[in-house]
Every structure is written in structure tokens, then in C-alpha cells.
Swiss-Prot record:
GO biological process: nucleotide-excision repair; SOS response
Notes on the domains: The beta-hairpin motif is involved in DNA binding.
The entry's keywords: ATP-binding, Cytoplasm, DNA damage, DNA excision, DNA repair, Excision nuclease, Nucleotide-binding, SOS response
All copies of domain Helicase ATP-binding, residue ranges: 31-417
Pfam families assigned: Helicase_C, ResIII, UVR, UvrB, UvrB_inter
This protein's name: UvrABC system protein B
Length: 677
């Protein structure tokens, strides 16, 4: 009912036209989608502009689109990329909102119950709500998500039904309006005003919707809305004056009072059945445990309308039958939406594996009286359920997996790069003397201001090689799994800027990562078969050198394995196609020129330091409270901007700095507690 308020078409803002294999791929994908095909593989070599191809396709088809990536970092990169493609349309980001998550679990062997423990990232939570709000109010929506999109979410019909529009001139009493906000699970807080709260000041009501960054001020004249204003949440400055505003629930699990009453009746019935089961089996401890916990949750739902862990009762709240799949993000899309699975060789198996792990954990909780059996139905979709809901799917990968290849009636190939760059030349060298040979090759690249990636099989070998190269005078660093995202970004930035010439690691795939300065990828012990030396891993690793005009890959091996041969044959096939095209069209390969910030702009700005100049100049014992508060407001504004740009690590860094300042300078004397954010 709200979708006529927004445009229905996508408008692509590209600085260039389709080139290379892109026009052919766009045409073929469009034809196959419009003819009704449900599974299509886009086999795109590294650097051929697969994301741009999908952007042009979305503009042509004008359908809501879900893009699934296999981790948050890649999802953020894609969201940032598509926001640049579609600045006038809704490009949303939907991932898990937990910075830290320990699910509820029970270990029977040690009789250990682990309480749910989680740290929620409020900025990511806002973006999740904005994604569902956009899907319910407009057609021109692209949502970039992780597997979070297959996990249980409240019913979209209830979420939509609960939302309402406030307009200037509307007759509504302040009391009724406050009741509506409370029913939508917004909290009244006249002091600590933050997202998800509302406050009252005379005839003025202010609310920060969970999916917005601004404050909505509703000015009343008696029982009539006189003005609707949008304000900056920190400064209070006027951003705009509106004719009306949409208010959606503060929780995806909101439901009507009638539904909740019915659900509570059903929960009590199931509880009694389960208690009889435990008592028949003389499991009195389990019975008492379940009764105490469930009755407590029911009392909270009756009094407040919700409880902690209410999602475990979602089957009853939604009115679903036992075993019926839960609602999830997919149910918020229109029926004709398009799904794009990025790096499908990784993402498809990931989607398929979520259900089994969740079931195993929940089963132990149910059997030992910590949860009702219906809690098992608060789960991710199994793969068949996912496949039934997504309709038409495009699988995107340089190395498609067996599943997607078996489902697709032939692949759409995108081999030719718009830049004219060809796949790297591959050379196989003997293992004997590989380190000395590698050192010589590194020195050659150093003279040309080029960079090198080296992949090893073991952590120990990577560490020893890093030490050896460092002693030999090479600017080298070791990239390993213990390095956090920000430090990883700093190392990659240092590599691109030339502060580091070589990166050594075990798994340097990082699909989707652009390192145009890398001209050599060295694969040590290439003939040791395993998942790090599989055909897929080889092709992905080879792709790290495909963005340089002089890209080469050196495989150190004494034997030619099947995986090596397949990856070499496929790379050479692509290389021949690319070279033939360049000769025929008179194309000269052009080096990729990409600013260093482009690779990391979603995660962090290079050498980004929080501005603490004010703090450095303040004498600690006699701190100026007003100055500190002013500085905190400035940092909060920067944090909101960083989160809006999907730079969540930067936003988190700012958040931690704000928390530290509040604890150090603003905590009340005698208080041992933490300042609530």
C-alpha cells in the first residue's frame, strides 16, 4: 500500500558503457531470465566486471534483487559498489547484527548449560530494519545479504500491518499515539534518547525509528498533528520538514494482541504435553526446568507483549504447523524478485550447511528441558526450502561448483575484460631450490615497483619463509587467520602503497579482492593435493595476478597433479580467448588504475586515526566537561556517517572511543557501572 510513494525503476549511474564480454553476457542473461529459466550460471573470470554486468541486468529487468555473499566483508564491498551504481534507488545491507554471539546451548556430557550471550551492533541492526522497510514500501530495492537472509524473522504481513503513517493535519490524540508507539515496541525514555526510543516534551513527541538515523519530531496542536520535522539526532538541527512519516515496528517479531493471546494458549498446551512426557519418563528435573522457564516467558508476554528469546516461540506466534519453515527475509520480497549468489562455489555449500548445525544444538536444549520442541522451528531454511522461495537464481563465480553447473542449462561466459588484460602466464618450477628462485623473482619485481603474493601450505612454513625473506632484506609481512579485519586491511593497504613488497599466507584467496599492483603469485608445494591445492583454489589464487599487465603465476611442484593440470588448462583456454579477442579488435591491455582507498573504503580509511587532538590538549585532573561532551557529539556524528557508508569497522572504532571517553570523563563518581550506549 506504500509502494506507489517511490520509483518503480532502477537508474544506473555508470561512468562507462558495457564492453568486452559484458554486452553479450547482459543480453544472454536477460533473455534466459525472461524466458523463465530458474538456474543460470555466469562464469566470469576475475576482473571481467561481473558486478557491473549484474547492475546493468538489474536496470534492464527492473526487479527487486537479492545478492547473497558468503561473508560480511564481501557483502559490504558489494553493497558499497551497488550504492555507487544506483544512488537514487534503495541498496540495503542485511547481515547478522551480532558483533559477538554465543547461542544458547546445552552439553549433556558435562551437564553444562550455556546461556545466550551476544553483543548487538546497533548500526547493523538499523540497516536490517531499513532493508525490510524498503522491501515493504518500494520496488526499486537491492538487498546485499549473507546467509542471515535464511534465518527466522517475523511475519512480513504482521510487520506491515503494524506500521502506520502520520500526516500533517491528522486527528489523533497524544495518548493514542504514545500507545501506538508502545505497541510497536518503542520505549519511552525522556533522558537517554536513542534509536528505538521516544520522548515527550509538552505537545511535542520525538521518536527515532529503528531503521532511520534522524529524529522525527511530531508537533501537536491539541489532537491534531501540526508539523512533522526530521532532525539530526546529535545536534538537533533541522534536516527537513515533511508532510508525513511512516513508522514501522522496533522489532521484526511484533504481532497483534489477538495473535499473542492465541499463541500463549498454544504455548501452554504444548507445555502441558511436554510436562506429561517428562513425568512419564521420570525426568522430573527437566520438567521443573521447562515449566519454570516457560511460565516466566509467558508472564512477560502477557504483561509486556514480548520476552527475551521470543523468537523461540515464533511458530506459535506465526500460527505455523510443526515443521513448517519460518518466515525470513526472502518473504519480504515481491514474488518476482531475482536472486544473485556471489562466489557461488563457496556460498551455495554455506547455505546448505546452516540447518543441520542449528538442529543439533536445539535438539539438546529440547531433550533436556530448556526449550519446548517448537523452538526447533525457529531455524534457518534448509536448502530445498531456500531453493523453493528464491525463484530465479544467477550463480556468479569464476569457478562454479558441481551443484550450480548441474542445475544450469549451459553457462554464460564472461572471459574478456574491459581493460584488455589477459589471464596470467603460468610456469611450473621444481621444488628444489624454490626459496632461492622465489627470492630472485621477488627482487626482479621490486625493481619494477610490483608486488608479490606467496601462498604456503602450513603456518610454520609461512612464518619461516617470512623470517627468511625479512633477513634477506625484503619488506615482507605474514597474513594469517589470527589477524583481525582492520589489521588485515592495513597490511593490504601497505602492500598496495609499496610499504610492503611481499605478503605470505596460507590462504590468500579472499575472493573479490582487488590488488592491481600484484604481478606475481607464487604457489609453494603446488603438487600437495588438498582443499588449498584444489582446482577451484588454484583458479581463484591465479586470479590474484590477473589484474596486472605482466601478471604471472609460478607453481613450485615436482609432479603434475590433476588439480594443477585442470587449472592450468582452464587458465590457458581463457588466456587464448582473451589474446585472440585483443588481436581481432586491436585492443591494447590497459593497467588497472585504482586508488588505494578503493580496496578498503568499505572497511576503513587508510591510516585512519580518530581525532583526539582535543583530548591530547586537555589536562586530565581538571577536565572541561563541556569540551568533552562537545567532542563526543562530534565523534558520534562521524560514527553515524561511517555506518551510513557501511564502514562498520571505522564506526565500531569510533563507538569504542566514545565509550572510553564516557567511562573516563563522564562516569558519575562512586559509580562502578558502565555508561549505557
Amino acid at each position: 500500500m506504500y509502494k506507489n510513494l517511490h520509483p518503480k525503476y532502477f537508474r544506473l549511474a555508470a561512468e562507462y558503457d558495457p564492453s568486452g564480454d559484458q554486452p553479450k553476457a547482459i543480453g544472454e542473461l536477460s533473455d534466459r531470465i525472461e524466458s523463465g529459466e530458474t538456474d543460470i550460471v555466469l562464469l566470469g573470470a576475475t576482473g571481467t566486471g561481473k558486478s557491473a554486468t549484474i547492475a546493468w541486468l538489474i536496470e534492464k529487468l527492473a526487479r527487486p534483487t537479492l545478492i547473497i555473499a558468503h561473508n560480511k566483508t564481501l557483502a559490504a564491498q558489494l553493497a558499497n559498489e551497488f550504492r555507487k551504481f544506483f544512488p537514487d534507488n534503495a541498496v540495503e545491507y542485511f547481515v547478522s547484527y551480532y558483533d559477538y554471539y554465543q547461542p544458547e546451548a546445552y552439553v549433556p556430557k558435562t551437564d553444562t548449560f550455556i546461556e545466550k550471550d551476544a553483543s548487538v551492533n546497533s548500526e547493523v541492526e538499523r540497516l536490517r530494519h531499513r532493508a525490510t522497510t524498503s522491501l515493504l514500501t518500494r520496488r526499486d530495492v537491492i538487498v546485499v545479504a549473507t546467509v542471515s537472509c535464511i534465518y527466522g524473522l517475523g511475519a512480513p504481513s504482521e510487520y506491515l500491518k503494524a506500521g502506520f503513517r502520520l500526516e500533517v493535519g491528522q486527528k489523533i490524540s497524544q495518548r493514542v499515539l504514545l500507545e501506538r508507539f508502545t505497541q510497536l515496541q518503542y520505549n519511552r525514555n525522556d533522558v537517554g534518547f536513542e534509536r528505538g526510543n521516544f520522548r515527550v516534551r509538552g505537545d511535542t513527541i520525538e521518536i527515532i525509528p529503528v531503521y532511520e538515523e534522524y529524529t522525527v519530531r511530531i508537533e501537536m496542536w491539541g489532537d491534531e498533528i501540526e508539523r512533522v520535522l526530521c532532525l539530526h539526532p546529535v545536534t538537533g538541527n533541522l534536516l527537513s520538514e515533511q508532510r508525513g512519516v511512516l513508522i514501522f515496528p522496533a522489532s521484526h517479531y511484533v504481532t497483534s494482541s489477538e495473535n499473542l493471546k492465541r499463541a500463549i494458549v498454544d504455548i501452554r498446551k504444548e507445555l502441558q504435553q511436554r510436562l506429561r512426557y517428562f513425568k512419564r519418563n521420570n525426568s522430573l528435573l527437566e520438567a521443573q526446568r521447562l515449566e519454570t522457564r516457560t511460565e516466566y516467558d509467558i508472564e512477560l508476554m502477557e504483561q509486556l507483549g514480548f520476552c527475551s528469546g521470543i523468537e523461540n516461540y515464533s511458530r506459535h506466534i506465526d500460527g505455523r504447523a510443526p515443521g513448517e519453515p519460518p518466515f525470513c527475509l526472502l518473504d519480504y520480497f515481491d514474488d518476482d524478485f531475482l536472486t544473485v549468489i556471489d562466489e557461488s562455489h563457496v556460498t551455495v555449500p554455506q547455505i546448505g550447511s546452516m540447518h543441520a548445525g542449528d538442529f543439533s544444538r536445539k535438539k539438546a536444549l529440547v531433550e533436556n528441558g530448556f526449550r519446548l520442541p517448537s523452538a526447533i522451528d525457529n531455524r534457518p531454511l534448509c536448502f530445498d526450502e531456500f531453493r523453493q522461495r528464491v525463484g530465479q537464481v544467477i550463480y556468479l563465480s569464476a569457478t562454479p561448483g558441481k551443484y550450480e553447473l548441474s542445475k544450469s542449462d549451459g553457462v554464460v561466459e564472461q572471459i574478456i575484460r574491459p581493460t584488455g588484460l589477459v589471464d596470467p602466464k603460468i610456469t611450473v618450477k621444481p621444488i628444489k631450490g624454490q626459496i632461492d628462485d622465489l627470492l630472485e623473482e621477488i627482487r626482479k619485481r621490486k625493481l619494477l615497483s610490483e608486488r608479490v603474493l606467496v601462498t604456503t601450505l602450513t603456518k610454520r612454513m609461512a612464518e619461516e619463509l617470512t623470517d627468511f625473506l625479512s633477513e634477506a632484506g625484503v619488506n615482507v609481512s605474514y597474513l594469517h587467520s589470527d589477524i583481525d579485519t582492520l589489521h588485515r586491511v592495513e597490511l593490504l593497504t601497505s602492500l598496495r602503497m609499496g610499504r610492503i613488497d611481499v605478503l605470505v599466507g596460507i590462504n590468500l584467496l579472499r575472493e573479490g579482492l582487488d590488488l592491481p599492483e600484484v604481478s606475481l603469485v607464487a604457489i609453494l608445494d603446488a603438487d600437495k593435493e588438498g582443499f588449498l591445492r584444489s582446482t577451484t583454489s588454484f583458479i581463484q589464487t591465479i586470479g590474484r595476478a590477473a589484474r596486472h599487465v605482466s601478471g604471472e603465476v609460478h607453481m613450485y611442484a615436482d609432479n603434475m597433479t590433476e588439480s594443477m593440470q585442470k587449472s592450468i588448462d582452464e587458465t590457458n583456454r581463457r588466456r587464448r580467448i582473451q589474446q585472440d579477442y585483443n588481436r581481432k579488435m586491436g585492443v591494447t591491455p590497459v593497467p588497472i588504475k585504482k586508488t588505494v582507498s578503493d580496496i578498503t573504503e568499505v572497511l576503513s580509511r587508510p591510516s585512519r586515526k580518530i581525532d583526539c587532538t582535543i583530548l591530547d590538549s586537555l589536562p586530565d585532573p581538571k577536565i572541561d566537561g563541556k569540551q568533552i561532551k562537545s567532542h563526543i557529539k562530534s565523534l558520534e556524528a562521524k560514527m553515524y556517517m561511517a555506518a551510513e557508508s557501511l564502514m562498520f569497522e571505522e564506526a565500531a572504532e569510533l563507538r569504542d572511543e566514545i565509550q572510553s571517553l564516557k567511562e573516563k570523563f563522564l562516569k558519575p563518581r562512586g559509580s562502578g557501572g558502565k555508561i549505557r550506549q
